[in-house]
């Protein structure tokens, strides 16, 4: 394939379409992403081969929920009593303290509303996730949901998808590297986890505007005062930007907190780096222009609009399109792509079940428990001081010429691991990171395969734009209602059969630094 064309469209035409129309324009001509990317040159076997790190965060999915059936992972073939959760009876379709529900498939092809694709939004609050975790026993998922969700929606947390339902996600897992021990940072909702993604803390001691334990309807503005990773990067002379989608106006940042930098007092100065690089850049227009002009910064945080975020009840297909969209942009400039690592992660599990019990800090561990005097005065706390994390497992892809798949990494990571990757690569320390968290999580260098030359050949990733187009209109009623806990419930099948994992492909383990 010509290096100047993507899917039959020239680089310049493609970038112009992205800048002019965003996702809507792209959907009109979406095709196979790239059948073959461009040669990335000889491998030197060093992390320094990677000059650009792009962090792309989606919303609210657990690892078992997406990849419990994926081959080579700690998934449904694992022998564990935790797959049998008590609290709902599939036979009677009712709450039942002794009833057992196992993971069951959300079939995205059934029904006029595709209710398997657009399911109700589970409770994923600080309280609900701590109650699900249940002191590390991890056996209280259904009773925790029953406190805030209707009876018919309570078992939603046990639903999962297969390759048939989210084909693009599975093809990405086959083409690159997947982490099956990547945990969200907080046993709680979106905003606390995104704060960890940017700064490695929620200010549990309450010294600088925290602690933040909930996700308010409106994003806080200049409320927090602790140091964030972009400030450390600026001080070290390492370029960075936060690219956020603005195509839907204020709605673009609903649920995803795309303007997160403005939550910090340091952003009050319009001349500051935080405003110039953390507020002004847009996605996809500014990002696409920077890629084409060879001025992509060393570090990019990218936040798509809420309709592409995968937040329930938005369909996963729309999120697949968003991931492929950012890949198209990077591939439009081979000189940039060959030196780039794209890490796609999910802010938190969204309330969806995962059988792996996360590591958590012992009581009293500095920085890992809320220590303000009156915990009941902290919004969303429910009187719970912690542990803060780790939270539950979420999907994570490492997409790069240096992470060719199918590969699987079993090392433990969380959102602060992305920041530690920058620390290792550029020598810029992560602010606020606790000694405990540093001791239990890695820096993600093990996700790269530097022992072999980089491989840029790509599979055909289907037609995600067209797939999203066919799904979204049918999901509109349930997507709108499901986001506010009023969607059409998905009936739990009876009798239940424990799902199994795929047997192929076989997944290798990357070399890491060599």
From Swiss-Prot:
Post-translational modification: Predicted to be exported by the Tat system. The position of the signal peptide cleavage has not been experimentally proven.
Superkingdom per UniProt: Bacteria
Alphabetized UniProt keyword annotations: Cell wall, Hydrolase, Secreted, Signal, Virulence
UniProt keyword Signal, yes or no: yes
Chain segments carrying region Disordered: 492-514
Record's keyword annotation contains Hydrolase: yes
Induction comment from the UniProt entry of this chain: Expression is induced in vitro in the presence of phosphatidylcholine.
Signal peptide (UniProt feature, chain positions): 1-37
GO MF term list: phosphatidylcholine phospholipase C activity
Subcellular location: Secreted, Cell wall
InterPro entries xrefs: Alkaline_phosphatase_core_sf (IPR017850), Phosphoesterase (IPR007312), TAT_signal (IPR006311)
PROSITE patterns documented for this protein: TAT
Reaction(s) the record says it catalyses: a 1,2-diacyl-sn-glycero-3-phosphocholine + H2O = phosphocholine + a 1,2-diacyl-sn-glycerol + H(+)
Disruption phenotype: Disruption of the gene in the clinical strain Mt103 leads to a reduction of the phospholipase C activity of the mutant. The plcABCD mutant exhibits a dramatic decrease in phospholipase C activity. The quadruple mutant is attenuated in the mouse model of infection, but not in infected THP-1 cells.
Gene Ontology terms: cellular component: extracellular region
Subcellular location, principal: secreted
Enzyme Commission number(s) from the entry: 3.1.4.3
Gene3D superfamilies xref list: Alkaline Phosphatase, subunit A
Record function comment: Involved in virulence. Induces cytotoxic effects on mouse macrophage cell lines, via direct or indirect enzymatic hydrolysis of cell membrane phospholipids. Hydrolyzes phosphatidylcholine.
Assigned protein family: Belongs to the bacterial phospholipase C family.
Name this protein carries in UniProt: Phospholipase C D
Source lineage: Bacteria, Bacillati, Actinomycetota, Actinomycetes, Mycobacteriales
Record gene name: plcD
């Amino acid at each position: 394939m010509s290096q100047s064309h993507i899917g039959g469209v020239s680089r310049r035409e493609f970038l112009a379409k992205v800048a002019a129309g965003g996702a809507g324009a792209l959907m009109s001509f979406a095709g196979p992403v790239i059948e073959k990317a461009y040669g990335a040159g000889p491998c030197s076997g060093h992390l320094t081969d990677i000059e650009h790190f792009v962090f792309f965060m989606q919303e609210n999915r657990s690892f078992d929920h997406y990849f419990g059936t994926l081959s080579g992972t700690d998934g449904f073939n694992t022998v564990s009593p935790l797959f049998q959760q008590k609290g709902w009876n599939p036979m009677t379709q009712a709450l039942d303290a002794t009833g057992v529900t196992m993971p069951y498939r959300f079939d995205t092809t059934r029904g006029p509303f595709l209710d398997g694709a657009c399911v109700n939004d589970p409770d994923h609050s600080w309280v609900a996730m701590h109650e699900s975790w249940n002191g590390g026993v991890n056996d209280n998922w259904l009773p925790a949901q029953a406190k805030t969700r209707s009876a018919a929606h309570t078992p939603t947390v046990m639903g999962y998808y297969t390759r048939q339902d989210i084909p693009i996600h599975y093809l990405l897992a086959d083409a690159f590297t997947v982490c099956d021990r990547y945990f969200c940072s907080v046993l709680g909702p979106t905003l606390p986890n995104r704060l960890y993604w940017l700064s490695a803390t929620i200010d549990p001691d309450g010294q600088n505007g925290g602690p933040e334990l909930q996700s308010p309807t409106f994003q806080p503005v200049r409320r927090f005062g602790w140091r964030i990773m972009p400030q450390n990067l600026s001080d070290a002379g390492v370029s960075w930007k936060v690219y956020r989608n603005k195509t839907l106006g204020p709605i673009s940042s609903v649920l995803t907190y795309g303007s997160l930098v403005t939550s910090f007092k340091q952003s009050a100065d319009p001349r500051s780096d935080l405003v110039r690089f953390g507020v002004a850049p847009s996605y996809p227009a500014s990002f696409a222009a920077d890629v084409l002009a060879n001025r992509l910064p060393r570090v990019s945080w990218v936040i798509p609009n809420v309709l592409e975020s995968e937040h329930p009840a938005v369909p996963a297909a729309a999120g697949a399109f968003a991931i492929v969209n950012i890949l198209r942009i990077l591939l439009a400039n081979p000189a940039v792509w060959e030196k780039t690592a794209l890490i796609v992660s999910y802010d938190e599990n969204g309330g969806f079940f995962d059988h792996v019990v996360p590591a958590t800090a012992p009581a009293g561990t500095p920085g890992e428990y809320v220590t303000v005097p009156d915990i009941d005065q902290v919004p969303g706390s429910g009187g719970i001081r912690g542990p803060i994390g780790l939270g539950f497992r979420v999907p994570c892809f490492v997409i790069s010429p240096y992470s060719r798949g199918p590969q699987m990494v079993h090392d433990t990571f969380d959102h602060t691991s992305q920041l530690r990757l920058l620390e290792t690569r550029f020598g810029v320390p992560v602010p606020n990171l606790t000694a405990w968290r540093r001791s239990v999580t890695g820096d993600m260098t093990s996700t790269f395969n530097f022992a072999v030359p980089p491989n840029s050949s790509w599979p055909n990733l289907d037609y995600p734009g067209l797939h999203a187009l066919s799904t979204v209109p049918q999901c509109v009623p349930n997507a709108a209602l499901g986001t506010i806990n009023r969607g059409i419930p998905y009936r739990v099948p009876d009798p239940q059969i424990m799902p199994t994992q795929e047997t192929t492909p076989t997944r290798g383990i990357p070399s890491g630094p060599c």
